[in-house]
Amino acid sequence: MSTPASAAPAALVRVPAGTTAGTAVREAGYPSKGPDVVVVVRDAEGGLRDLSWVPDADVDVEPVAANTDDGRSVIRHSAAHVLAQAVQQEFPEAKLGIGPPIKDGFYYDFAVERPFTPEDLANLEKRMKKIVKGSQRFSRRVVDSLEEARAELANEPFKLELIDDKSGIDDPEIMEVGGNELTIYDNLDPRTGEKVWGDLCRGPHIPTTKHIPAFKLTRSSAAYWRGNQDNADLQRIYGTAWESAEAQEQHLELLAEAERRDHRKLGSELDLFSFPDELGSGLPVFHPRGGIIRTEMEDYSRKRHVEEGYEFVNTPHITKGHLYEVSGHLDWYRDGMFPAMHIDEELNEDGTVRKPGQDYYLKPMNCPMHNLIFRSRGRSYRELPLRLFEFGSVYRYEKSGVVHGLTRVRGMTQDDAHIYCTREQMRDELATTLQFVLGLLKDYGLDDFYLELSTKNPDKFVGDDAVWEEATATLAEVAESSGLNLVPDPGGAAFYGPKISVQVQDALGRTWQMSTIQLDFNLPERFDLEYTASDGTKKRPVMIHRALFGSIERFFGVLTEHYAGAFPAWLAPVQVVGIPVAETFADHLFDVVKRLKAAGVRAEVDASDDRMQKKIFNNTAQKVPFMLLAGARDVEAGAVSFRFRDGTQVNGVPVDDAVRIVTDWIGRRENASPTAELLQSGREG
């Protein structure tokens, strides 16, 4: 299941001076309806233009079809306008915020007297359908002056702010202003040409509302004006729009499946973790079953790190603030840290300070403490590369509005490593680290990757440009040599160095950022890290930051959704459950379970009072990979019958074979769910 693919770029079309782009496209024979209908064109500079655009001179343009990424984006932006028109018809007092297209959809923010209800969304959809059916024309109009724009939009305070801030806005989600002129898009009645509604917007838009063949409003939520919690409270409506009903249905099926796989829902249903209100937002607790999965994840990671030459360290959860002054975190990352704890102050009886206190912080990152371990004694080139590894707990102040289940938390455990090496070792160490990261992710069943290269943010970095350029070039070379697709992320690096991030696609085709590998020449300088080179001189090591899972919590959430809660048998909290056909046969299964437990398998017998079919139903719902059934024939033959998650079954398997099948499957760390077909093929093989 995946999002509909985009069409290939179209051949160029010549638009004569004085002719609309739409006329030239039609005369060139492009479709006038359907999912590949042309909705806008791309000019020679790469900008998107309305089909009503009339160039001053002959120009070649690229037709942009509805079933392309750009085409869908334009459809969604136009759908946002239709939504805003419907809202102001239904709620005349509503004030307009912004309404951009986003991935797979759009939203629009409104200042209204109360939150929107599901009934409101249903009514708004009906209004939108009438507007779409009315085939209103989108007409671009240049406003001659700021004064004229302010007068026309005098009742829209948020639009007035955008007009006043026009020159200082650099936000891709603000579609209202941009370029060298202010424009308003009017929706015109197709019969009379009269203006029905309008909005401040830089465009472009589809020719008419009829070019929105499929849309749906999905939800509403609270929002802040321009994303700042200090600004006005708004209400946001989200929707989706597509080039065809079929494409939208495919997307909605994907959303429904994603909802079924939501790790927050599965975490509760499978008794894996919870978020007690008493602890606070973004602070999960893992229950025994979730603890088993987490322990298995961590133990396998530890084993692989030992094999790769990593050494384990451990650091405290809090530190004096001075450490993060040295590292630069307090200068560049303070907003992401919890407030200081001022402690150790001692007072005299009269209240005067006898001993001043100090600021302590919960650590947001482990790297400064690992630097102290490196610096704790003299280091020789013979020790390098030195690979320090820790499951380190860190704490980051995420705003409550962005905290989301396990994938965005405030307290997390990182599988954090810092590698110290020479300049000569740097490239090979990066390449080895990347291959280790990719291999370990594959071991957990994630094998669809691409890489992202995050480069310097010119407004937020430490060090000099030459060092950054060298680090970036080295990372780019290593990433390109991996053979994976490399996508640029300009300005996305942390303040201390560029990074490669591994982007992983899950079973639904969604992309998650997982591992990061960051090259850093700056922190070794700030911490005065040195090693003795082979010629006896002191040199700075290169530092490589590397988190493979990103965080245990995030990785746990991603795996839960990737497997829809049906974890591979080697990770499953309960790997085998025995289900007797009747209580008479339970002892037979207890003997089998005893053998499995002795072999290290997490096995148990369902001794509840439920009937056999209910037990099968319950344990299937709990995603148990192996269910062993036993009736009279099984007991008589010294056998069991296998039942699997998918409902398939293999009867009469001798107990010795059954124990071997289960232990071999788990021992191989198979990530596929066992089935009758896989078991039979394995036995035959």
From Swiss-Prot:
Binds 1 zinc ion per subunit. It comes from the Bacteria. CDD domains: ThrRS_anticodon, ThrRS_core. Keywords: Aminoacyl-tRNA synthetase, ATP-binding, Cytoplasm, Ligase, Metal-binding, Nucleotide-binding, Protein biosynthesis, RNA-binding, tRNA-binding, Zinc. Residues 262-568 are annotated as: Catalytic. One of its GO terms (biological process) is threonyl-tRNA aminoacylation. Zn(2+) binds at residues 367, 418, 545. Pfam families: HGTP_anticodon, tRNA-synt_2b, tRNA_SAD. Coiled coil: none annotated. The keyword Ion transport does not apply. It is found in: Cytoplasm. It catalyses: tRNA(Thr) + L-threonine + ATP = L-threonyl-tRNA(Thr) + AMP + diphosphate + H(+). The keyword Transmembrane does not apply. SMART domains: tRNA_SAD. GO terms for molecular function: ATP binding; metal ion binding; threonine-tRNA ligase activity; tRNA binding. Residues 1-65 form the TGS domain. GO terms for cellular component: cytoplasm. Its cofactor is Zn(2+). Homodimer. PANTHER family: THREONINE--TRNA LIGASE, CHLOROPLASTIC_MITOCHONDRIAL 2 (PTHR11451:SF44), THREONINE-TRNA LIGASE (PTHR11451). Belongs to the class-II aminoacyl-tRNA synthetase family. Catalyzes the attachment of threonine to tRNA(Thr) in a two-step reaction: L-threonine is first activated by ATP to form Thr-AMP and then transferred to the acceptor end of tRNA(Thr). Also edits incorrectly charged L-seryl-tRNA(Thr). This is Threonine--tRNA ligase. The gene is thrS.
